[in-house]
């Protein structure tokens, strides 16, 4: 209760926005130390609260983290609904509920004003995928006269051949490669590690990059163990991977928007279509729950309908 008293006192004697920013700083520390979340997850939660702070500033609403109520937050919800789709809005609401639960946990508040605010109903969005032909065309479109050509080929093949998240790809280290055993060690969400099998094709592409163009780089000592590097010998960013893929998609006139995650979805879908066990796919993707992996069953049903229409004698 002392923390509650002090926070109310500070909210009356300090600038309201500063009190938001101080508590946001404390919350960020909590997410990092107590919950051990990844940098990207923490940034997402920060952005949720920063959007609320910006809204309060824009409309000159005098409310601190302690005094803000459901009326102000309901209006904020209406405000964000104008610019966010249902899925993004639902995620933001969930993030703010977590923030106010933290304030209750720290005795700053007695209630969660977000409890009465419902998330919009959203359907289960099926992942976007591309065909093996599309993937071959993307790889063929790489300019191998440039120094980064071999690297980009290895990147695309690793995304598709191992089903990695983009952050898992950029964090991949040379010391994570167990080619003799046919596996790579992947560090996923929550710093959880898993071993993912790797094909001979992907091994060849990575080795070609490692023992050729990568050797030509002046590698920054801080990134000597990082597999995929930029021209300056530093770790590639997630944004750069997105850019590489986007440029190749434009180059082959691919009539859909794709991202690094499209390769991960395609990896899982193509395995399932060709008879792979769902549990095995779950382990390779690093999903906590089989329910998350089951979404690929919905995609595969189209494939099953095609099969029965083509091969069943009564179709």
PLM regions: where:
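Conserved catalytic core of the tyrosine transesterase superfamily
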Residues: 5-315
